[in-house]
């Protein structure tokens, strides 16, 4: 269910992910964001379109497996997260780095 409140839409997208692979995807007009694990593809599409005022063509999601983390003799896990790869329409861009 797509939330109608703009504040709820803004809470779905946590932060942009800037890695080598994500930077290569920028050339194909694809942007990578970390989103809450419960977010669905229509929710992510509505959130990106309302936050950045762009047209989204496609949304792909990835939930990488959790990694083990050891603290002393105790073994725990890193938190679960979800990535969204958002493809924008030609001509639309998102400014991740504001120009100084």
Curated annotation (Swiss-Prot):
GO CC annotations on file: ribonucleoprotein complex; ribosome
One Gene Ontology MF term: rRNA binding
Gene3D superfamilies in the cross-refs: 3.30.70.330
Keywords: Ribonucleoprotein, Ribosomal protein, RNA-binding, rRNA-binding
Biological process according to GO: translation
InterPro entries, alphabetized: Nucleotide-bd_a/b_plait_sf, Ribosomal_uL23-like, Ribosomal_uL23/eL15/eS24_sf, Ribosomal_uL23_CS
HAMAP family per the UniProt record, alphabetical: Ribosomal_uL23_B
PANTHER family listed in its UniProt record: 60S RIBOSOMAL PROTEIN L23A (PTHR11620)
Family: Belongs to the universal ribosomal protein uL23 family.
Primary role: One of the early assembly proteins it binds 23S rRNA. One of the proteins that surrounds the polypeptide exit tunnel on the outside of the ribosome. Forms the main docking site for trigger factor binding to the ribosome.
Subunit text: Part of the 50S ribosomal subunit. Contacts protein L29, and trigger factor when it is bound to the ribosome.
Protein name: Large ribosomal subunit protein uL23
Species of origin: Rippkaea orientalis (strain PCC 8801 / RF-1)
